[in-house]
């Protein structure tokens, strides 16, 4: 299969939003449907493949390269492992905290994989990328035109939406030069009031779609404790079917758009409209009450 036919997608999202869990469960469902997939973990935590491999954390390309002296000293079989439903699994890794650029591992890993034929005979390559910041390194799959479809995992919480808007801004920056497009928002529910409606509204403001609303279910945590995807742990569960629906939506998705990020003021107005944030009047009232309490305790 030629590289042109491979769909290269990327999951971005705020740290802690459940991005890696959502992406692995979705990839597992896609693999069940016969799709040939490789996951390239681009998060320094190296947790993008552990549910597929039933392991704590896969040894990363950058870690092995540091041990050997150079990435050229590695063999593909050492870093490319096969997981659930024959999904290929790679973790790029990153430097020690406080030293160097974590994005460097992504650049090194992708170049190594391409040069060693890892992209052959695939339908999808999925990049799992840290998305609190879209700096040069973490934007590499977007900037270099590797990932063509971006899926943002978010929720109805303010910081998750803030990160989603920032990621959309990063996609816009490279949309014309690299051809990258936003495939949609995936709402990983936190049971925020009016969450479905809120994320649908945000998606429209960003000129995209809410691709799927993933309900909150403790079975996800039960599967994670066993280092398994829900599709493997409880294949007949409602949650496994939710991931299958999401997987099919990604496979069928043709709605790839150039995003229209909003300003911070517009995002705050949206949160006020949906009752996530208080308006200026409520803010001033709360501040006055706090000041009153402080005066009475002095």
Curated annotation (Swiss-Prot):
Key word Plastid present:
no
Record keywords: 4Fe-4S, ADP-ribosylation, ATP-binding, Iron, Iron-sulfur, Metal-binding, Nitrogen fixation, Nucleotide-binding, Oxidoreductase
Q: Name one GO biological process term.
A: nitrogen fixation
One Pfam family this chain carries?
Fer4_NifH
Reported modifications of this chain: The reversible ADP-ribosylation of Arg-104 inactivates the nitrogenase reductase and regulates nitrogenase activity.
Its function, per the record, reads: The key enzymatic reactions in nitrogen fixation are catalyzed by the nitrogenase complex, which has 2 components: the iron protein and the molybdenum-iron protein.
Q: Which GO terms describe its molecular function?
A: 4 iron, 4 sulfur cluster binding; ATP binding; metal ion binding; nitrogenase activity
What organism is recorded for this protein? Cyanothece sp. (strain PCC 7425 / ATCC 29141)
Residues reported to bind [4Fe-4S] cluster: 101, 135
Query: Key word Iron present in the record?
Result: yes
Per its Swiss-Prot or TrEMBL entry, what cofactor is needed?
Answer: [4Fe-4S] cluster
By its UniProt entry, which HAMAP family does this protein fall under?
NifH (MF_00533)
Report the protein name in the record: Nitrogenase iron protein
Instruction: Show the NCBIfam families listed in the entry.
Output: nifH
Which positions are annotated as binding ATP? 13-20
User: Could you give the cofactor binding note from the entry?
Assistant: Binds 1 [4Fe-4S] cluster per dimer.
Q: Which family does it belong to?
A: Belongs to the NifH/BchL/ChlL family.
Question: Subunit structure, briefly?
Answer: Homodimer.
According to its UniProt record, the EC number is 1.18.6.1
Which reaction does this chain catalyze?
N2 + 8 reduced [2Fe-2S]-[ferredoxin] + 16 ATP + 16 H2O = H2 + 8 oxidized [2Fe-2S]-[ferredoxin] + 2 NH4(+) + 16 ADP + 16 phosphate + 6 H(+)
Q: Where are residues bearing ADP-ribosylarginine located in the sequence?
A: 104
């Amino acid at each position: 299969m030629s590289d042109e036919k491979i769909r290269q997608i990327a999951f971005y999202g705020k740290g802690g939003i459940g991005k890696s869990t959502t992406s692995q469960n979705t990839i597992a469902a896609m693999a069940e449907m016969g799709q040939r997939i490789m996951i390239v973990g681009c998060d320094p935590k190296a947790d993008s493949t552990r549910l597929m491999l039933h392991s704590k954390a896969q040894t990363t390309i950058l870690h092995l390269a540091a041990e050997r002296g150079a990435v050229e000293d590695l063999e593909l079989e050492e870093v490319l492992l096969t997981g659930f439903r024959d999904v290929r699994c790679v973790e790029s890794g990153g430097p020690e905290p406080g030293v160097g650029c974590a994005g460097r591992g992504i650049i090194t890993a992708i170049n190594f994989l391409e040069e060693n034929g890892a992209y052959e005979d695939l339908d999808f390559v999925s990049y799992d990328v840290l998305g609190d910041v879209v700096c040069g390194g973490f934007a590499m799959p977007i900037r270099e035109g590797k990932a063509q479809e971006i899926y943002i995992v978010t929720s109805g919480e303010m910081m998750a939406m803030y990160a989603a808007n920032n990621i959309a801004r990063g996609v816009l920056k490279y949309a014309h030069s690299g051809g990258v497009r936003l495939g949609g928002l995936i709402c990983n529910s936190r049971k925020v009031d009016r969450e479905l409606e809120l994320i649908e509204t945000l998606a429209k403001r960003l000129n995209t779609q809410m691709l799927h609303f993933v309900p909150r279910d403790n079975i996800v945590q039960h599967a994670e404790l066993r280092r398994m995807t829900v599709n493997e742990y409880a294949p007949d569960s409602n949650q496994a079917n939710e991931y299958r629906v999401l997987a099919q939506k990604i496979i069928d998705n043709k709605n790839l758009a150039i995003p229209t990020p909003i300003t911070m003021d517009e995002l705050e107005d949206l949160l006020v409209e949906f009752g996530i944030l208080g308006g200026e009047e409520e803010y001033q009232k709360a501040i006055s009450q706090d000041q009153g309490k402080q005066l009475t305790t002095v």
